[in-house]
Amino acid sequence: MRGVTRVLVSFMGLACLAATTAWAQHPQAREGFWIGFGFGYGSAKPSCDGCGTLDSRGGFTGFLKLGGTLSKQLLLGGEVNAWTKADSGVTDQLGNVSAAVYYYPAVSSGFFLKGGVGFSSFREMDGATADGTGVGFVAGLGYDVRVGGNISITPVGNFYFGSVGDIKVSGATNSTGWKQHVFDFGLGVTFH
């Protein structure tokens, strides 16, 4: 896990450094439709009624976002965040689908803060499928590093939370009070 995190952080740093010249040539402009996607690594921590202490686990993450521009500092869109881990024949998947607002405090900067609300889900597959859906939210930050007129490399940090509630296996309740949260770091591409 530490090796993957180091590689990802190093790659993000190099991408930002390599894009410095391109960034100076391509100023920040936010207009119209935008879409982005990326991948990363994150730590998930679940809890539930009667489960005792569940450990945090590292896994791969991904995101997809798209939307429209409301102003030079405010974007509105939808975002899907997912975390997955496969180990010993068991695959766990956690995710959020959110309506999100992206706020750029300085018009000339690529730095942004985001927040959103929506749905959260959990799924575990190990022969039988355990799953549940509830409410969730996402918060995060990032930086659009312009590498072309309409393209940015976008390092991000995300936190997403879900209050899933009941987890069911074949229609029968297996766990109650399920909650989950994920912290992740990723690197994406955004098309403006």
Outline where the language-model segments fall.
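Cleavable N-terminal export/targeting peptides
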Residues: 1-29
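Low-complexity, intrinsically disordered/propeptide-like segments
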Residues: 11-20, 66, 142, 176
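Mature extracytoplasmic/luminal segments of secretory-pathway proteins
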Residues: 13, 45-48
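Amphipathic alpha-helical interaction segments
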Residues: 19, 41-42, 167-168
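Gram-negative (and chloroplast) outer-membrane scaffold detector with strong preference
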Residues: 25-29, 33, 39-45, 60-161, ...
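Hydrophobic transmembrane alpha-helices
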Residues: 48-55
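Outer-membrane beta-barrel and related beta-rich outer-membrane complex signature
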Residues: 49, 90, 127, 166-169
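Solvent-exposed loop segments that connect transmembrane elements
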Residues: 52, 167-176
